[in-house]
């Protein structure tokens, strides 16, 4: 570890931690992630409903998260992805406008409280993901006030990205006008590589998520990932699997935006054949899809229920992506049917909404149990049936069936089960089918099905 100690050195003396056990991508593929915004998930102390200005801080804290870890683990999730932790420009509740890499955002809490959160997570077998943002620093502040990049020479000259297909512009110009760091500058490179290594050591983070990946040179991500020395994944907002797949050469996984777009087009108002087309692209392009991160909702896009106001289709989409190849990430509030639109409306506060009796909460608990018990994450995905209204795939002895229509019946004859095998739907008691003359006859009632071999 480098000589720099973060924030309050005495805290390291006061707290007793086990040595950081860095986790490989193979270890991470068995995990399921609950993504939350630190400012929006839970406040310290009493939990009651209240409104807030979604464009500013609402009051969520590290301690608030800590007090609701049982809510997260009760749903079956064993990893959390929290907001970027460092001091930000005032008003930047989301954490993506860093002002000082060596101070914790006081709105979230103290360095001690962050360490307490992570320590408590580890006691409950919950891993914690650090969100890293080495593309830029805070906008509209004097460069001299930014630590440690307080000189103009640490930034690219001002230019605007007017062509998102121009990689040189992406890497050297300003994303949304944000001061673009010059990663090729020796000081910038050295400080950020030291920072990622030290902050993981000091706080015992288990994995790292990268923001704004295509706006940073690939060679930097390679060195950054080596310094992190744990599981890393990055987000690239593109529908092209061939474009984002190359980034797996520089980090362990990528956020699966192409799958997100395929679900959006195929499940709500389109054809399920769109999912089939994506599967073929995935198998052709990715080094390994099992290390990618999949989601239905996230903090950058309007929620599913905002553009597709159908809870039944929402449940189908959740089960489809959750068992798909990759590490599933569930966005906070989906279990409460949040339906916010574009940023910041998709970043609702969840204060007073930690209900564990909703049907989505219960459904995801079952889904997590099945994924873990049957070690689905080790199995390849095999498509078994696809048409405009129905889609089915297996991973080992688990058969997933979804539909974008209400009532339909399908016979699956391409499968790996034996004659007479009994398959039961874990989401509905008594919903069992048998393999008869090589066929699995499935009757869909509009709800997703998780069949397992009994």
PLM regions and their residue ranges:
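Active-site-proximal helices and loops of the catalytic beta/alpha 8
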Residues: 14, 118, 122, 194-295, ...
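Short acidic/histidine-rich active-site segments
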Residues: 331-336
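Bacterial N-terminal signal peptides that target proteins for export
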Residues: 1-7
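Substrate-binding/active-site clefts of carbohydrate-active enzymes
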Residues: 24-32, 37-203, 219-234, 241-243
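Bacterial Sec-dependent signal peptides at the C-terminal "C-region" and cleavage site
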Residues: 15-27
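Cleavable N-terminal signal peptides of Sec/SRP-targeted secreted and luminal proteins
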Residues: 7-15
